[in-house]
């Protein structure tokens, strides 16, 4: 006869707080700072979908309609940029072009600084 095995109890579970805390930082450019990178602004103005897919690809996310709030929130929390989901919602719904261009400019600058 075999002895009954004891169930395994998980005491700590990995989750959101298990990784290193992001460093606090700010956006590299302002929301309406279009002239700091005219190429990004022109791309967003004339081919918004292309820019949205490019940003999603940069973040290793899928390019689906309606994910802009989630991507902005993910990006902001990943880099410790202050704000809230409510802020992200308002920015992406009131000015989706400015929001998307700001994320792309930020990605480009962080890449140039090798912090992306």
From Swiss-Prot:
Source domain of life: Eukaryota
A Pfam family hit: PLAC8
Any one GO biological process: positive regulation of transcription by RNA polymerase II
The family this protein is said to belong to: Belongs to the cornifelin family.
Name under which the protein is recorded: Placenta-specific gene 8 protein
Organism the protein comes from: Bos taurus
Lineage: Eukaryota, Metazoa, Chordata, Craniata, Vertebrata
